[in-house]
């Protein structure tokens, strides 16, 4: 084992699943600092994987409780874009299979963009059904953001390719006969809602990036329509667009001047 290079040791550790592996026992006895650093890194990685597994199991408790009652099609529902000054509110409804597993799944806001994009692709592959609901700034202005969010959620459910038997919703109640559970901070407590959060977030971010290409002076691809200093200054200089929510302050005040 002493003749193994550090790079070879690194590759071997990638294959090792547990400490009982004979190769791991040999590497443990290798006193080179480089090898011992790799062994420590392996331990930390396994510890992280275990924590992610425990977190995922904890986030599956709502789904598991429903499945024990014979419920198969459980739709997690979440929204993105209630607060911005521009762009639509986007919701997603996601029905996951019982064997669904993506370690590290969490509220989309707590994930890096790269991780969100990767999870988005994985959810698309694994999900039984995905529905998306999009409500425009004009409708938001007409019926208010709360009602628009509810409408987008109902649209997302209607756009599913299967009929859900139960809805798990992030902090909302929907006017539908489908049984539902409203969960405060559900995107961090339910794998289905978390998956919906990621689908909605990536979908909306892509729309706002397209808007950024159409109106480069507003920087939508950077702030996603939120009321940042850059965005407010752009509105002052270039004016209010159709994509802006005219019922939202300070845009409402700008129009009334």
UniProtKB/Swiss-Prot annotation:
* Free-text cofactor note: Manganese or magnesium. Binds 1 divalent metal ion per monomer in the absence of substrate. May bind a second metal ion after substrate binding.
The record's subcellular locations are: Cytoplasm
- Taxonomically, the superkingdom here is Bacteria
SUPFAM superfamilies named in the record? Ribonuclease H-like
Keywords in alphabetical order: Cytoplasm, Endonuclease, Hydrolase, Manganese, Metal-binding, Nuclease
Family named by the database record: Belongs to the RNase HII family.
| NCBIfam families reported for this sequence | PRK00015.1-1, PRK00015.1-3
Q: What is the name of this protein?
A: Ribonuclease HII
Source organism of the structure: Bacillus cereus (strain ATCC 14579 / DSM 31 / CCUG 7414 / JCM 2152 / NBRC 15305 / NCIMB 9373 / NCTC 2599 / NRRL B-3711)
Question: What lineage is on file?
Answer: Bacteria, Bacillati, Bacillota, Bacilli, Bacillales
The gene from which this protein is expressed is rnhB
